[in-house]
């Protein structure tokens, strides 16, 4: 639980959305960066280069580049991307 392993935000590329279109950024969502991890409340923002920024309500442990971030709206999986 070292403080340097805590991240309050991440960037993600290679985005893929189940509905085929990105979800609107102005809504609250939850995200996971690890399998079986508890859903973490977050907000998203899209960057001009097509990537996404995810800002968590509380810092997340050991966010790792190259792994996936998966976005949810309640119980519905929206898609996600690769952490950069």
How should each PLM-predicted stretch be described?
Residues 1-84:
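AMP-forming adenylation/ATP pyrophosphatase catalytic core
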């Amino acid at each position: 639980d070292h403080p340097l392993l805590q991240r309050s935000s991440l960037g993600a590329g290679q985005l893929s959305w189940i509905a085929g279109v990105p979800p609107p950024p102005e809504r609250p969502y939850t995200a996971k960066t690890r399998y079986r991890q508890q859903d973490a409340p977050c907000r998203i923002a899209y960057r001009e280069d097509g990537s996404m920024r995810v800002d968590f309500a509380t810092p997340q442990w050991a966010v790792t580049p190259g792994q996936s971030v998966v976005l949810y709206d309640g119980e519905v999986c929206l898609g996600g991307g690769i952490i950069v």
